Amino acid sequence: MGQQNIKILQSFNAPAETIFSILTDHESFGQVINAKIKRVVDSQGENKNGLGSVRRISAFPGVAFEETVTTFEPNQLMEYVISKGSPIKNHRGRMEFYDEQGQTRLTYTIDFEPKLPFLLLGSIIKKALEKSIGDGLRRLAERYDI
């Protein structure tokens, strides 16, 4: 039952402002990774998906959890933690956006530990997240290929 780390790198032929707005909008992000995501608490700031906003993710039937945005720097950075539910703990997600001459380089990292002491549970969750998020980001990048 050890700490699991995921790091996904993806480039996009679109400005950081465009990719940031897609990936930090909770419902839009759900479409990208093919998951049911709904914002349940709006941020008190300018962007309703910003600092303090909460999204509910329904991963599988009967399995739902909430994530709270802890850092929100427009077009640069979003961080979040699981704040309710989930079979994992000590979870932290971080999306870093780098604008490079009108293109975007994204570094997406997730760290977590499984709550339950089942052998290989962490590895199974890690593989599922890598596939879902990685495939979704690749599909999004393909939309901007020239």
Give the positions of each predicted feature.
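Hydrophobic ligand-binding cavity/cleft-lining segments
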Residues: M1-Q44
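Hydrophobic/aromatic beta-strand elements that line small-molecule binding cavities or substrate pockets
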Residues: I8-Q10, E66-T71, H91-D99
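Structured loop/turn residues at secondary-structure junctions
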Residues: S11, P15, P61, S83-G85, ...
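Short strand-connecting beta-turns/loops that link adjacent beta-strands
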Residues: P15, G62, P74-N75, E100-Q103
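Glycine-rich portal/gate segments that line the openings of hydrophobic small-molecule binding cavities
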Residues: Q31, V40-S86, D135-I146
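Beta-strand/loop substructures that line and gate deep hydrophobic ligand-binding cavities in soluble
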Residues: S83-G134, I146
